[in-house]
């Protein structure tokens, strides 16, 4: 052996289930090279591992305009009852005129939908009834639809609108079924069945 090397080990402990070990080699005795070509030493490879960063907060951030429409003191991404904020009587609704069929405009229009299966409040405020008592959408999941006149849910404070033709909302629309065109004879996936 031309040179002897001693190895020292340094062990560093990290939290919980990770461990780092570093080896440092130092030559104890050095001899001059006998070859005219310099000796090529390879540096030991360094592997640095970094743990996953812990999330610093909630992954969902609600916009300022998101409303707690279930009255439970929390905001939710679950869509049960679509909330449309009330507008002052004189305010223009140009930006929402294109989607007027999806507005929850008047209570009387809603009562004509769904082949009479649903019962809706008619007229002004009234204490919010629980779902499943025959009003709203006919599903029971334990929250009030408080339609007091202060929240704008009542129909008595609204100006008379032109009655629109009833059209199903997004939850009532059935998807259009496209008829399948027969595949050409030589096309992949075409079979004689």
Curated annotation (Swiss-Prot):
Residues 1-19 have a biased composition (Polar residues). Coiled coil: none annotated. Its main location: nucleus. It is found in: Nucleus. This is Type 1 phosphatases regulator YPI1. PANTHER family: E3 UBIQUITIN-PROTEIN LIGASE PPP1R11 (PTHR20835:SF0), E3 UBIQUITIN-PROTEIN LIGASE PPP1R11-RELATED (PTHR20835). It comes from the Eukaryota. Residues 1-193 are annotated as: Disordered. The keyword Amino-acid biosynthesis does not apply. Regulator of type 1 phosphatases which maintains protein phosphatase activity under strict control. GO terms for molecular function: protein phosphatase 1 binding; protein serine/threonine phosphatase inhibitor activity. Belongs to the YPI1 family. Residues 20-32, 183-193 have a biased composition (Low complexity). Keywords: Nucleus. GO terms for cellular component: nucleus. Disulfide bonds: none annotated. Residues 130-146 have a biased composition (Basic and acidic residues). Pfam families: PPI_Ypi1 (PF07491). The keyword Ribonucleoprotein does not apply.
